[in-house]
């Protein structure tokens, strides 16, 4: 299905947030996920279904000053 990930249109096979993270090779838990501007707690990643056209933001911490 076609979704937007971090502002970029992508064709993905995943149907849930947790599967998308695996598909995109994100590991660990040092990031936050928002679907259609709704930040999801990690406890909901496995149950949150994705739909065509969803906008997903994967937010990772950055070091800087």
Label each PLM-derived region with a short phrase.
Residues 1-64:
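Ubiquitin-like/PB1-type beta-grasp interaction modules and other compact soluble beta-rich domains
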